Amino acid sequence: MTVTYSSKVANATFFGFHRLLLKWRGSIYKLLYREFIVFAVLYTAISLVYRLLLTGAQKRYFEKLSIYCDRYAEQIPVTFVLGFYVTLVVNRWWNQFVNLPWPDRLMLLISSSVHGSDQHGRLLRRTLMRYVNLTSLLIFRSVSTAVYKRFPTMDHVVEAGFMTADERKLFDHLKSPHLKYWVPFIWFGNLATKARNEGRIRDSVDLQSLMTEMNRYRSWCSLLFGYDWVGIPLVYTQVVTLAVYTFFFACLIGRQFLDPTKGYVGHDLDLYVPIFTLLQFFFYAGWLKVAEQLINPFGEDDDDFETNWCIDRNLQVSLLAVDEMHMSLPKMKKDIYWDDSAARPPYTLAAADYCIPSFLGSTIQMGLSGSNFPAEDWLWNYEKHGNRHSVMRRVKRFLSTHEHPGSPRRRRSFGRQASDSSMFLPPSPARDLLDVPSRNPHRGSPTRKQSRSQEGSPKLHSSMGELSTIRETSRTSTLQSLSPQSSVRSSPTKMPQVPEVLITAAEAPAFSADSHQHDSTTSILSLEFTGVQPSGTEQQVEPSGTPPGDPNPQTTSASTERDLFKFEEDLEDDRFPKRWSLPEFLESRHTSLGNLGPDPVSPRDALLLPDTETPSETNGIHPGAGSALAPDILYLMESLDKETDILEFNNEHTGESPKGTPQRPRTWF
């Protein structure tokens, strides 16, 4: 029988548990008083023998034995062993209570899913519910001594109404050496399937819900059976019991009061009654009694589960729910808050203190002064002042390595750029399109200014120029002649009219207009792609195709004509990348992989001329003719993904070029 005292400890008061200490049923006094009396009697008997019956020599020997037992009895880990054992027992006890079978969910499903107000429908619902209660009864009868005393045989089960005589015969005819608590579950499933076939259960989903819930109910019963079958290992129980009783057996001798005149350490007083030793026995032995009572909650102790009450309650409630309450509904009426959007139930005078406003959050009443609100430029000030003096930024800046543009290292590298990539989009305009302008036009981010200055400086990408370029071309139709064009770009941040090719060139030999060799530092050049004619020493191949939109392609021998380039930029300004344009397209020549490599200096190399103020007068090309080459560029872009040539550039150092003369990496398209 469970001892309930929840109402007495509902409120914390001064010495609130004092009333619980006076209870007898389910108390520690009722469990421990016998052992406590035995321990006190044994202690008193040994004390009387020591004081009255022993001689002087025998007393000296007993005193040495008492000191020895007191010293080494503390080495027994009673607290450690008891703590783990009682924790394990309490967890096991609570898990068994959580898994007690309750038929409330099943009776709800049966009452709402099995239809029919006639006698057959009523019989179906009551029979299904009776099978559910019979399953739990068979389990309780096998694990609980109190239930077994109530139903010692199956005849008592039939007499109690949980099983009919025909069901008893069928149950007994099943020859099985195992516990047959699962038989009512099979009957439940068969009867539910029959009700589905008869139309009493109108949907297969309802049948599945019934079977799922019944399977859950059966698993609760199986778990209780498993707890009864497999308990806490016997060794653990024996170790705990021996540790506790051995410790207090040693205390019977070791905690005796010795003669104070002998001067033993800790034996200055002779109180006759060992108060703290008795308290220690009360606590440790009572701790062990807690584990003994909770290790099997299906017994007949004061704090064991009320299994017989569970059987009665489940049967009464379940039959009431599926029979008398089936389709029994009260008349619907409007509630008292029908026209009130904010329902507010009344409070009594005793509960008036519990009427409190709704909780809206802990920060709802927190106020902030005007100085705590940041200004609009707080992020800029944080980046300007906080990051400038950042220690981590200084460490990273110190540990970072920067390669000088004039580094004498020779490096051979390759790179690949797919034809579907953005190779015709220059980096500067693309980056400008993604940049978000600051709110203040007179204030710019330091990082943004730094990126723009790096973007405009030809020396910035010197360390990036070690990668050679890979251009996708066609051996048959890529190298073709295009009509001349020119494009003028006034600002590096303005999107060009003609798509450009981003070429990352390694340190390669470059030739100036006066045939002098110069030191070509690595840079990123933004070229307007119109075609480049390689060295005259290479093999020339006639183009196999003509770009659409150019009916009269210009074909000129490479030995008699030169490729003219226009350099559109202020020669004295080093902030922006150099841009080259081809004023006219000559006969294209294809370079195979076998012919790659640095060529000797030839007087017939393409002459690269920087742009001047009058490019039209020199080349005869009007500046506004750049927009007429859009079909040619499209044709070239379509022919890029046919084949890939890998070009290799070797780092060779030549003499310095004069100031203002652009560097010319050798590139084949």
From Swiss-Prot:
Q: Does the keyword Transmembrane apply?
A: yes
Query: Is Transmembrane one of the keywords?
Result: yes
Q: What residue ranges lie in the Cytoplasmic compartment?
A: 1-31, 83-237, 289-669
Positions of region (Disordered): 399-496, 533-560, 591-627, 646-669
Basic and acidic residues compositional bias, start-end: 646-656
Keywords from the UniProt entry? Calcium, Cell membrane, Chloride, Chloride channel, Ion channel, Ion transport, Membrane, Metal-binding, Transmembrane, Transmembrane helix, Transport
Which terms in the Gene Ontology molecular function aspect does this entry carry?
chloride channel activity; intracellularly calcium-gated chloride channel activity; ligand-gated monoatomic anion channel activity; metal ion binding
Q: Mind telling me which InterPro entries this protein's record contains?
A: Bestrophin, Bestrophin-like
Q: Which residues bind Ca(2+)?
A: 10, 293, 296, 301, 304
Basic residues bias: where? 440-451
Polar residues composition bias: residue spans? 533-543
**Residues in the Extracellular compartment per record:** 52-60, 256-274
Full protein name: Bestrophin-3
Give the organism, scientific name.
Answer: Mus musculus (Mouse)
